[in-house]
Amino acid sequence: LNGGLLNIDNIREFKKICEIAKQNPNKYMKVGLRVNFDVGNGLLSRFGLDSNSTEFVDVLNTIRNIENIELSGLHFHISRARDLESWKKRVIGMLSLVEKYKLDNLQYIDLGSGMYGRLDSELQEQFGNTPTYRDYAEIVAGEMSRFYANKGMKPILFTEPGTTIVSKYFHVFMKVLDIKSIRGKYFALLDGSFHNVGEICGLKKVPMRIKHICEGIDYQNVNFVGYTCLEQDVIYSGYSGELSIGDEVEVCNVGGYSIVDKPPFIHPDIPAYMQKDNQLICNKREQTLDDIFAPYIFEMTES
């Protein structure tokens, strides 16, 4: 009602916006629609409106019939579709909707996130030949430019490369607390957990550097595990090399979500530092037990 733009994900949200528009006929409301269609990556996303459904058509027709609601843009966002072919399908899919439903006055088209960013060499080898930002631009902006070449109104093209940009610059530092052997398999216990690293450690072997504190022993096929009681708390699988208790482990390329994904489980969250002018500056303090228990209400009863 105060000039913001509302991005609609589902029918319930749309109906609510229609009610608000009806109650405020003098207020002009701009909305965007998050759409959902297949880009061939094998993931059925739960987000957005199915662009092949009658519900989607009904939403478009309803917007056209309400004087104080304007469709300002289309939004598409999907996970695990970083390859160029998926990006080509998403931009062509969006432009097909523009053409099919004559959406000639859109102010923006948002293609969401999901690009490859700069990667450490260890990750680069696992992902193979990854596209550059220029590769994405040629595919996406190229299709947009050709489609809108002879059209009057040209929408703004948005992408959302958040983690794409920052992933390479987030590192987590941990320490080896113990090394144990179970039926011939070695495990190195760290003072961090997979929650500090993010889901990347379950998908790929994250880049890892070890600072040896003292002369260690050469191990084969060691799993680096976290301090939680969860079997899936594995940070790195299959390390071979020198290792000793007290060694410092640097886990690289851990992404942007790792700084917020850590639940208050077993240990409070770790602090965060940024490097500036060759100095470390704390920009997020260590979480305390008081922080964790602050939302809880403890009622004391007299015995």
State each model region's role.
Residues 13-16, 55-59, 70, 86, ...:
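General structural feature for long, well-ordered alpha-helical segments within catalytic domains
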Residues 83-90, 119-134, 167-175, 236-239:
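Short glycine/threonine-rich loop-to-helix capping motif typified by GTGT followed
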Residues 91-158:
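Acidic, glycine-rich loop-and-beta core segments that form the ion-binding/anion-interacting portion
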Residues 152-303:
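Charged (often Lys/Glu-rich) extended helix/loop segments that serve as interaction or gating elements
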